[in-house]
Curated annotation (Swiss-Prot):
Residues 255-487 form the Protein kinase domain. Pfam families: PK_Tyr_Ser-Thr. SUPFAM superfamilies: Protein kinase-like (PK-like) (SSF56112). The keyword Nucleotide-binding applies. ATP binds at residues 261-269, 283. The protein kinase domain is predicted to be catalytically inactive. Residues 196-206, 511-538 have a biased composition (Low complexity). Residues 556-567 have a biased composition (Basic residues). Residues 148-206, 511-567 are annotated as: Disordered. Gene3D superfamilies: Phosphorylase Kinase, domain 1, Transferase(Phosphotransferase) domain 1. PROSITE patterns: PROTEIN_KINASE_DOM (PS50011). This is Inactive protein kinase SELMODRAFT_444075. Residues 159-169 have a biased composition (Polar residues).
Length: 567
């Protein structure tokens, strides 16, 4: 179907398209077919990487390997295209990469290509093994290269490169050396500084956003799961694999005590290793006898939808006889719990199994069982769960990081077992020093603690309408303002009692109506009066805290906005 659509599109441009399907193709058939078709471009799928080496050896055409919509150019040969395909080139193609290109031929965006060297010594000696990777390289760039090549005045590319034929084969062409020298001096200064052990000051402002920006510019290949084992994360988009009980029994050593990890609300968790070497966590379901196959498989389907780089991913399952097991990827570096509360605590987070509705749709009535300390109040009361429930859970995690306490700790005294209930009075009474983990001994960044406590204050609000969105929480953690309208008399401070910083938290940019503007003005007036009354009160021994002021502004602003919307 795709090739048929391409044929119809190119017919308008007088481009003849021929499609041929070869069955039981042997190794090396691609170079021979390319010679038969006299192809100038050979585009290979990622599953045909092995054929790429043969094409480099036997062909002189342009060769590209496409992996996840990102092409890797093995050879870009724009030289002497008018010659017959089987005619020998005057320059040995094995000693020149990008043969036929000079600096004047390369378009403006071409210098964004990344040069990668092969890790193996055998391939490193062959220049053809070096790949030019273009993360978002489009055919328009290649077309521009072709046009510039035909229109370019001056010596031909072959004349430019002929001066390099007398040099030893081990040396790169002069054009390539000049190109690399320009890139090294212009774009790779950071790498040079790193090699010289030059330390640079760390800018903590918007550090999270910078990391996301760097992640987008990095290689499309998923990063290692952790810095210890360097295991890659499972490929996203794959359906969960169905294991047999014998396979999981073999992987866990017969569910031996040596591989025991934790005892959860739904069953025991064991560490295992699959035949391909991947470490997994296998969870046995205690309530397996009460579930049918269809119900269990429906729950597995729901869990498999949770595929994100920072989430533990479901790899597979087992539904054999009355046995029900789930197979997750194993995080050998441990979870947040293990680093905060000790290595012996459970290392696999489990929020229970969600269930489909009878009509097969997933809605707010879906039950998510477990992890009581992280569940939002509206869920525990009504059973309804929305995206603001995730915001509440994230606020609890922030409090865990600041206080070093568990979300629920039954070993503590009454009133201190639930982290949110224990922290709210300190947040309300501005006793923030009571919230900070004493084990830190003052070794923390005050601004970061400010941002975390402010975000946690808003996230754990009992009213879900008042809680910010996760995008707003991200900006809070970075120390940014959350709206275009922000009034601050001085820098805010949670711990040093600095003057109040007034900040409207809301997305004013999305709605410029007069009703929202008037509600914003009313918020400013209302919490200016609140600030004055709080400071003049006889019971107030310190100025109104910025976190409380900002939280109050957010609450009033949201309520006023909701009221205007309903009107």
């Amino acid at each position: 179907m795709v090739m048929e659509k391409l044929r119809k599109i190119h017919d308008l441009k007088k481009v003849h398209t021929t499609l041929e399907i070869l069955q039981f193709a042997r190794r090396g058939v691609i170079p021979s077919e390319a010679k038969r078709f006299r192809a100038t471009w050979v585009v290979l799928d990622r599953n045909l990487k092995s054929e790429g080496k043969l094409c480099l050896q036997e062909l002189n055409s342009n060769i590209v390997v496409v992996h996840r919509s990102n092409p890797k150019i093995l050879r870009l040969n724009l030289k002497r295209r008018d010659l017959p395909y089987d005619e020998e080139e005057s320059i040995d193609s094995s000693s020149v990469l990008l043969n036929g290109l000079s600096l004047s031929v390369m378009p403006k965006g071409f210098d964004q290509l990344y040069w990668e060297s092969s890790t193996s010594s055998s391939e490193a000696s062959s220049p053809d093994s070096r790949l030019v990777t273009a993360p978002k390289f489009e055919l328009s760039v290649l077309e521009e290269l072709l046009k510039n090549e035909t229109r370019r005045k001056g010596p031909s590319p072959s004349e430019v490169l002929n001066s390099t034929t007398s040099s030893p084969a081990s040396h790169k062409p002069q054009v390539l050396n000049d190109f690399l020298r320009m890139k090294e001096s212009r774009e790779y200064t950071e790498e040079t500084d790193t090699q010289r052990n030059v330390s640079r000051p760390v800018d903590r402002v918007s550090s999270v956003r910078k990391q996301i920006h760097l992640r987008k510019q990095s290689s499309p290949q998923p990063p290692p799961l952790c810095s210890i084992c360097q295991h890659k994360t499972p490929v996203f988009g794959k359906p969960p694999r169905k294991f047999t009980f014998a396979e999981l029994q073999l992987a866990t050593g017969g569910f031996s005590d040596v591989n025991f990890l934790a005892e959860g609300g739904y069953g025991s968790v064991y560490r295992g290793r699959l035949p391909d070497g991947q470490a997994v966590a296998v969870k046995q379901h205690k309530l397996a006898s009460t579930q049918g196959d269809k119900e269990f498989c429906a729950e597995v389907e729901v869990l498999s939808c949770a595929q994100q780089r920072n989430l533990v991913m479901l790899i597979g399952y087992c539904a054999e006889d009355k046995k029900r097991l789930l197979v997750y990827e194993f995080v050998c570096n441990g979870s947040l719990d293990s680093h905060l509360y000790g290595r012996r605590s459970k290392t696999v987070g489990d929020f229970g199994l969600a269930r489909w509705q009878p009509n097969g749709e997933l809605g707010v009535e879906t039950r998510v069982i477990g992890a009581f300390g992280y569940l939002a109040p509206e869920y525990t009361q009504t059973g309804q769960i929305t995206e603001k429930a995730d915001v509440y859970s994230f606020g609890i995690v922030l409090l865990e990081l600041v206080s070093g306490r568990k979300a629920v700790d039954l070993s503590r005294n009454k009133g201190e077992m639930c982290l949110s209930e224990w922290a709210r009075p300190f947040l309300r009474e501005q006793k923030y020093e009571k919230l900070i983990d004493q084990r830190l001994r003052g070794r923390f960044c005050v601004n970061e603690v400010e941002n975390m406590l402010l975000a946690a204050t808003l996230c754990i609000d009992p009213d879900p309408l008042i809680r910010p969105r996760m995008s707003q929480v991200l900006r809070l953690l970075e120390g940014d303002s959350l709206s275009d309208t922000s009034l601050s008399s001085s820098s805010s401070g949670l711990l040093n009692g600095s003057p109040v910083s007034i900040l409207l938290i809301g997305d004013l940019s999305q709605d410029s109506s007069s009703s929202r503007s008037s509600s914003a003005s009313s918020v400013l007036k209302s919490f200016s009066r609140t600030q004055h009354s709080s400071r003049s009160s006889s019971n107030a021994g310190s100025p109104l805290n910025p976190a409380a002021t900002q939280a109050l502004a957010f609450k009033k602003y949201n309520k006023n906005t909701t009221r205007h919307t309903q009107d």
